[in-house]
């Protein structure tokens, strides 16, 4: 899903060269992770099953503003939150699984933390390129708003268990 989101952003905002470069790197890395997960699953006799989307990302996306460049900034800030939450989940799971999978989760944690930083840096770059009145303040306000929404999503009961879901019902 992360690779798909990044590719959509690349096509939609093709005029931001720095965005193109960073997102192309992210897509390659996410697709490598996808292949690695498929290999893990195959080695363990796990069958691939498509899952419906949980409410986490959709709940965050409700906060995206409807005008540009603010909509892009919001998507990037939300991307950072998704990556940060992935870090938290991989960190929590790594000591609970077998050694091989734990090592892989720690590897993913490092990658996701880099993606978190990349998304925030891109959001700030877009805000500066668009010559917003106070780019740093705009980004900070969006982080604070999305943090509150994200907190509610994580702490509230969730009927559908997913990697980024809230408290299981």
What are these regions (language model features)?
Residues 1-169:
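Non-heme di-metal
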């Amino acid at each position: 899903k992360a690779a798909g989101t990044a590719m959509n952003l690349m096509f939609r905002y093709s005029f931001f060269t720095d965005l193109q470069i960073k997102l192309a790197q992210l897509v390659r890395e996410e697709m490598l992770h996808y292949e690695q997960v498929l290999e893990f699953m195959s080695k363990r006799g796990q069958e691939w099953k498509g899952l419906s989307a949980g409410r986490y990302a959709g709940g965050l996306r409700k906060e995206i503003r409807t005008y540009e460049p603010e909509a892009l900034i919001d998507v990037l800030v939300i991307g950072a939150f998704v990556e940060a939450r992935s870090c938290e989940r991989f960190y929590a799971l790594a000591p609970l699984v077998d050694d091989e999978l734990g090592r892989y989760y720690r590897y993913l944690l490092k990658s996701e933390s880099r993606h978190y930083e990349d998304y925030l840096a891109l959001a700030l770059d877009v805000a500066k390129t668009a010559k917003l009145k106070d780019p740093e303040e705009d980004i900070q306000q969006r982080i604070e708003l999305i943090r509150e929404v994200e907190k509610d999503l994580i702490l509230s009961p969730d009927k559908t268990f997913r990697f980024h879901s809230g408290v299981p019902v």
